[in-house]
């Protein structure tokens, strides 16, 4: 049967990735992403944008993204599971990712697929623990919105 079937000997794979980041034991960042198999990858994309590249939520969720799609599609209704696999080594990138970067990825052996629309649908909320400032953002291209209310 299908890998996500609930039956003896299988380990269903789900894509839910609610993410809460703590700083000194207190919540400072929350991420939610809708998008099936792309959820984990998009969560990592925007978390790295925040942690490594210092982007605030509005920039982190709207920056160009990428996703590997060389695995079996969990949501493919095709009963022939062999046809549910995307081409090995394929990489989907946002159309806004620079041509030079796309060419470099292709040179490294990736089959680059350019997507005009969004890759998954992220929202992010950040609390600056020093100032108390709240930042909330959703990717408008994905029609996502985020809001926060400071009750202090």
What are these regions, as identified by a protein language model?
Residues 1-115:
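Proteins synthesized as precursors that undergo proteolytic processing into mature forms
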């Amino acid at each position: 049967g299908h890998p996500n079937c609930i039956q003896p000997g299988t380990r269903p794979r789900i894509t839910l990735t609610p993410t809460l980041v703590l700083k000194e034991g207190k919540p400072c960042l929350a991420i939610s992403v809708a998008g099936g198999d792309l959820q984990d990858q998009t969560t990592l994309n925007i978390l790295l944008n925040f942690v490594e590249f210092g982007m605030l939520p509005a920039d982190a969720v709207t920056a160009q993204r990428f996703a590997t799609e060389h695995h079996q599609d969990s949501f493919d209704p095709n009963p022939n599971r062999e046809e549910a696999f995307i081409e090995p080594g394929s990489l989907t990138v946002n159309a806004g990712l620079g041509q030079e970067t796309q060419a470099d990825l292709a040179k490294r052996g990736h089959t680059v697929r350019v997507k005009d629309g969004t890759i998954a649908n992220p929202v992010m909320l950040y609390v600056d623990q020093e100032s108390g400032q709240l930042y909330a953002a959703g990717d408008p291209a994905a029609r996502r919105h985020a809001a926060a209310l400071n009750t202090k």
